[in-house]
Every structure is written in structure tokens, then in C-alpha cells.
UniProtKB/Swiss-Prot annotation:
Protein name as catalogued: Large ribosomal subunit protein bL25
Pfam families (alphabetical): Ribosomal_L25p, Ribosomal_TL5_C
Keywords per UniProt: Ribonucleoprotein, Ribosomal protein, RNA-binding, rRNA-binding
MF (Gene Ontology): 5S rRNA binding; structural constituent of ribosome
Length: 207
């Protein structure tokens, strides 16, 4: 279920790319909090704590401002550095206890498909509605004994109590296919023919 972490924040007063770079050099992440009809609030969050917290993209955070006021927020958008993979900016959405929200949740696969087959996930994540303070980290499907041509549909997804999958029943989550083995014999013949052809061209060029 969702992590609930307290992070002390400060109000951001300087804006622009230069100010953002300066904040990051100081170990802070610029962020904006949206929600509940309020004007967006610009904050600075400690980089180390925040980066660890949002490894789970649905982490529930409690941000504590300078006045000691606490607000529950969820990551809405996480912008990362293209090379360093550090968090450059966060968009956060404020939530309340008891409020239902829809988030993308990872699909985990259990079981083994029939011999000679393999499964392909059509959905790596699925939308799930749950209490903002009790979000699942993952949902599960079973492919145990599934054979080629079988499909795992939305109703087959195992969702924790209190959560609801937000997909139509006919949506395919995973498909089981027959493993196609490459004929190495044919490949060897083709390589041999190519080698003979190259050798013939080489001899012709010497004449």
C-alpha cells in the first residue's frame, strides 16, 4: 500500500531556469502542488528524501510547510534528468483522507505458462481507483497453465480489497503465444551459401 512519508518543504520565491538550477545545486527539487480548487503552490523539497520517496510513483507524501501545516499529496508528474535519472521537478496533487483517486498501478505476473509458450503483457500498468491513503503498489494476474491462444482479461486481475479496476471487461491484459523456434539448420545453409558466393566473387575479381 501507499507509503506515507513526512517531508519538510519551503515556499519557492525565485523562478526561472537559473533559479531552478541553483535550487538543484543546493539539494532541492522545485515542485508545484495542485488540487481542490486552490491556486498552485510552488515549493522546494529536499532532493535526497524526495527522490527516495518517489521511487514508488504512487507514494503518498505529507508535506510540512514552514508554519507546521501538513498537506497530503501524490505525485502527478515526475520529471527526471535524461542522463543522471535524478528528479528535476515534481507536479503534486493534494488529496484528502477518504478521497478516491485513480492511479496507474504495476501489473505483476504469477505462475508458469504451458511448456512451449510465453506470455506478453498488453498492459504493463492499469488504472485503479482507491482511497488516496491506501493505494496498492501493484495488482496481480495469474498465467499458471495458460496455453497458446489464451488471454488474460480485465476481470482476471486480482485487485486488493477497497480498490477497483478502471477497465472494461473485454480488455486484454496479457496474451499467451506459442514460442517460435528459429531453424538454425536453415540459417547455417544460408550462411554457407553466402560464404561460397563471396568466395566466388573474390576469385572472379582476381582473373
Amino acid at each position: 500500500m501507499s507509503d506515507q512519508l513526512k517531508i519538510k518543504v519551503t515556499r519557492r520565491t525565485d523562478f526561472g531556469k537559473g533559479a531552478a538550477r541553483q535550487a538543484r545545486r543546493a539539494g532541492l527539487i522545485p515542485a508545484v502542488v495542485y488540487g481542490h480548487g486552490q491556486e498552485p503552490v510552488h515549493l522546494l523539497l529536499p532532493a535526497q528524501e524526495t527522490t527516495l520517496a518517489v521511487r514508488n510513483p504512487n507514494a503518498l507524501l505529507t508535506v510540512v510547510n514552514e508554519a507546521g501545516e501538513e498537506h497530503l499529496v501524490l505525485p502527478k508528474d515526475i520529471q527526471r534528468h535524461a542522463i543522471k535519472d535524478t528528479v528535476d521537478h515534481l507536479d503534486l496533487i493534494e488529496v484528502r483522507r477518504g478521497e478516491k483517486v485513480v492511479v496507474e498501478v504495476t501489473v505483476q505476473v504469477e505462475g508458469e505458462v504451458a511448456p512451449g509458450t510465453e506470455y506478453v503483457l498488453d498492459y504493463v500498468t492499469v488504472p485503479v481507483e482507491a482511497d488516496a491513503t491506501d493505494l496498492p503498489e501493484a495488482v496481480t494476474i495469474s498465467v499458471e497453465g495458460r496455453e497458446a491462444g489464451d488471454h488474460v482479461y480485465a476481470p482476471d486481475v486480482q485487485v486488493p480489497a477497497g480498490a477497483t479496476l478502471q477497465l472494461e471487461d473485454d480488455i486484454v491484459i496479457a496474451t499467451v503465444n506459442e514460442v517460435v523456434e528459429q531453424d538454425l539448420g536453415d540459417e547455417s545453409v544460408q550462411e554457407e551459401q553466402a560464404a561460397e558466393s563471396a568466395e566466388g566473387e573474390s576469385e572472379g575479381s582476381e582473373d
